[in-house]
Amino acid sequence: MRYDKLTIIGLPKKFKVYYALDYLYPDGQLPDNPDEILYDEWPADGDEGEDAMMVYEYNKSATGVYLAYNENVHALSFELSPWASDADVKLYVKLANAVLKKHPRTKLYAQYDILKGLTEEDEKKMIADRQSYVKRLLKTKEGFTMEGLFHGCTLKDAHLRPAPTLDIQARDLRQLFADMQWEKEGKEEEKQ
């Protein structure tokens, strides 16, 4: 898929991946009011010598964005799942552009291509890629497993709601999957 793995090279030695989310806020730091916090993260497993985390947007993300910072080469890697919701794609683009803006001497690589940043057009193409990926899987009429932030789901053809077109069915499924991540999480918290 288009730009599903990106790397920013040339970050300063003092860069910490855990502060990357702060770049998305106007003052460069988390708001004092917890209700104004839109994004969050949790530590993830990275390769040796890497600090990694999953970044997500509350109530909208399906898979989140995987970030890994390698201190040895001063590189920040971004990864986006094929199951990512539109909100995940937007977060991915915002975060990459925010890091580039904060550190203007860095370079953004998509495999061997150097990019100046991600555009709105790139964002639309990335969303369309994910939509067509789900559509292609729906055409096979076979089951498949979607991995999310909090929950995965194995889907069989019998589970699908009928829709007038495959486009609508794929869009509805992607939205339902994103909503499912947050509904189940809320129900589990109520039980505790």
Regions found by a protein language model. Name each.
Residues M1-Q192:
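Acidic (Asp/Glu-rich) sequence patches and key acidic residues
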